[in-house]
Amino acid sequence: MEFTESPEVAGFRAEVRTWMAENLPKLSWPEPPDLESKLPFWRSYQSMLFEAGYAGLTWSTEFGGQGIDERRASVFTEEAQSAGAPERLNTIGEDFAGPTIAHFGTQEQKDAHLRRILTGEDIWCQLFSEPESGSDLASLRTKAVKVEGGYRITGQKIWTSRAQLASY
């Protein structure tokens, strides 16, 4: 197993490390203590990432991402953690919803959501936890049935992380 980094990965690591050193001090530290108060702070950080080209690292450039490989994306995470960067607020949007919309969504859905996910304007959550399921997705019972004017949702959820902040 080879543990040395390629010159491309090492260069990306140095770039991220420099960016973190130059930009993290610009955030209004300390991070606010309660979740609702964190929203402007998180959005500011996400906006900084977007403007610097560090949002949607593995997304296709067609959809506003950088189109880089998973190795360099993991280097970004390593360097962000080492630098004490705040956690990303919109991981569900950026890591799950956005790529799904990019792959399967209509052009209208892509236009409406992808950029707003990357900039942090819209926060996404996932509703998996149910009384009899936990996170066992195969046993979920909640259903969405198409009806005139939208969908009828039947089922029950226990909790959802950051739901109170989510647009979707």
Predicted regions and their residues:
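Intrinsic disorder at enzyme termini
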Residues: M1-R13
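Buried hydrophobic positions in well-ordered alpha/beta secondary-structure cores of metabolic enzymes
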Residues: V9, M20, G53, S60, ...
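A short, Trp-centered hydrophobic/proline-enriched beta-strand micro-motif
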Residues: G120-F128
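A short core secondary-structure module
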Residues: R141, G150, T154-Y168
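Hydrophobic, small-residue-rich alpha-helical packing segments that form membrane-like cores
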Residues: S135-D136, Y151
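Short secondary-structure junction/hinge motifs that connect adjacent elements
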Residues: K26-L49
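Internal helix-loop-helix
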Residues: Q46, F50-E121, S161-Y168
